[in-house]
Amino acid sequence: MSDDMVLHFSSNSSNQSDHSLPDKIAKLEARLTGKTPSSAKPPQQQQQQQQQVSLWSSASAAVKVVTSTPPGLSETSISDSDDENTGDFLIRANTKKRQKVQESNNFSVVDHVEPQEAAYDGRKNDAESKTGLDVSKKKQGRGRASSTGRGRGSKTNNDVTKSQFVVAPVSAASQLDASDQKDFRPDGQLRNGECSLQDEDLKSLRAKIAMLEEELRKSRQDSSEYHHLVRNLENEVKDLKDQEQQGKQKTTKVISDLLISVSKTERQEARTKVRNESLRLGSVGVLRTGTIIAETWEDGQMLKDLNAQLRQLLETKEAIERQRKLLKKRQNGDKNDGTDTESGAQEEDIIPDEVYKSRLTSIKREEEAVLRERERYTLEKGLLMREMKRIRDEDGSRFNHFPVLNSRYALLNLLGKGGFSEVYKAYDLVDHRYVACKLHGLNAQWSEEKKQSYIRHANRECEIHKSLVHHHIVRLWDKFHIDMHTFCTVLEYCSGKDLDAVLKATSNLPEKEARIIIVQIVQGLVYLNKKSQKIIHYDLKPGNVLFDEFGVAKVTDFGLSKIVEDNVGSQGMELTSQGAGTYWYLPPECFELNKTPMISSKVDVWSVGVLFYQMLFGKRPFGHDQSQERILREDTIIKAKKVEFPVTRPAISNEAKDLIRRCLTYNQEDRPDVLTMAQDPYLAYSKK
């Protein structure tokens, strides 16, 4: 058996450099056979053994395989069995196991065996314990009903068991050699391998470091260039922004200067025109009566000339009438004398009478023309007085020096002045458009309570107005404070006149023109009454209806507006500001004194009726020639239970009159609200 194993080991060996290998093999054979190393062998076997030793490359795997003894079998029994069966069986290498070991680990042969017995015995015991475990596993996993031997010929059960005990130690020893391969490797070779690997790794790392350092250097260089470029760009952007800012400032300054120059020219032209018109139409003078000084109007040359023409026409008319009377008296005297008159005499009497009639007709036409001129004079006088008042208010305003408010709005000329506010035409230097700046001022002599009340009132107006976006309602763009006593609201600018100026220039409007204006006003009111919180304007009058450059009517001034809460019933809301508003355009319920008035959108419906009536007939339906104090004192509106229509040329349609009657219904319960009025067929336009 030992000879066959020697042959098996020699076939797997590739190392021939170890000359002490025969002694080691002799010791191993002695252990396997239970004999001493000095036991003699046949010369033929020794010669074969020496020949095979020179071809060995590794003995560690063979040592581990041979030294492993299966549990339950002694060395003597194994050697005996081998001696008994060496003639019949030949021990061969497990080629399958060998292929697995070579494919998985590709083990190398150990060059020398540890000479110390203690270390050798320890490795032997470890191998035996591992071999026992492997044998038990193979017995459980590889048991079959019948098996065939790996040698030549058939084997008995004892032979199969023996072959299993021989093969199993080889596998276990191979595993042990794989796990302890590093233990049998020479320290020098291990250090040389590790050093070579470390040198290669070090070279690779140094190459990588050099490459990374080069990349870092390039990145830093690029970063420096980029930073330099960024700084240059930032400086350029800063310079451009500075230039742009300077350009904007220069542009704003140029625009502001041009606007101021134009406004100054307009102011001078307006004052020159007023002076010239004052000579023609009249001027305001001062009348002193004792200690009372009052302003009075002094008529101009135009009215004096018109009055002179009227007097002359009247005198001529009276003279002609006297001549006609004398002619008739002479004709009547001739008839009483009974004298016959010839036909020629009759013609002489008839012709003068026809001349007198013709002349009287001509005088009447001239008189009507002069009266029309006087009416036009009255309208021009009203416009002149309004312009004179505007100029006087502008001269007395503390904002008449063309300031720029909020670094944005350049004030130009005064448009008008109310009780506690001034409205200036201004230019928005940011959005580049004309706007109207309404300056709200607090009287320094007011009490703090009154100031707070006015501020709340103005803030409420702004809140209401800013939420309104409709093409028939003037927009509110902005709001800001000027000082402790003044703030400004910026409104949409309407370059056209207001309805009050239109009615002053023309006593009455054609029905077609008046109708389209009322339709636009009603559309704005419908918008106010379709919001989640309905709004009552409460101060509709000609001065609060503006026209833009295209003639579109827009409602403005929501200073007295009322917000109708959701919980208000059909009766409306309480009027808490009784006495405010313009009395000619307010309904009777606003003048009730015995109880708190209840109002609704029907207040605006009454105002629409008054506006429509005034546009068609040239005067208000109730209290036209009365002051507000007289209206309040004489209860003019409370007594206005029926509306009367004057005769006009051309005549007003019945549909227009019916709409006015419905709007001026005395009882609030019977009067339509805004949404109902808007459904009136007269206010609907349809394509023909």
UniProtKB/Swiss-Prot annotation:
Source species, domain of life: Eukaryota
Annotated GO CC locations: cytoplasm; nucleus
InterPro entries reported for this sequence: Kinase-like_dom_sf, Prot_kinase_dom, Protein_kinase_ATP_BS, Ser/Thr_kinase_AS
Annotated residues for binding of ATP: 415-423, 438
Keyword presence, Nucleotide-binding: yes
Keywords, sorted A to Z: ATP-binding, Coiled coil, Kinase, Nucleotide-binding, Nucleus, Phosphoprotein, Serine/threonine-protein kinase, Transferase
Biased amino acid composition, Basic and acidic residues: 20-32, 111-137, 179-188
UniProt feature, compositional bias: Polar residues: 155-164
Sequence ranges assigned to domain Protein kinase in this UniProt record: 409-683
EC numbers, comma separated: 2.7.11.1
Listed Pfam families: Pkinase (PF00069)
Molecular function terms from GO: ATP binding; identical protein binding; protein serine kinase activity; protein serine/threonine kinase activity
Active site: 539 (proton acceptor)
Location relative to the cell: Nucleus
Subunit structure: Homooligomer. Interacts with TKI1 and ASF1B/SGA1.
Role, per record: Required for correct initiation of floral organ primordia and for proper development of organ primordia. Phosphorylates in vitro ASF1B/SGA1, the C-terminal part of TKI1 and histone H3.
Similarity remark: Belongs to the protein kinase superfamily. Ser/Thr protein kinase family.
Official protein name in the record: Serine/threonine-protein kinase TOUSLED
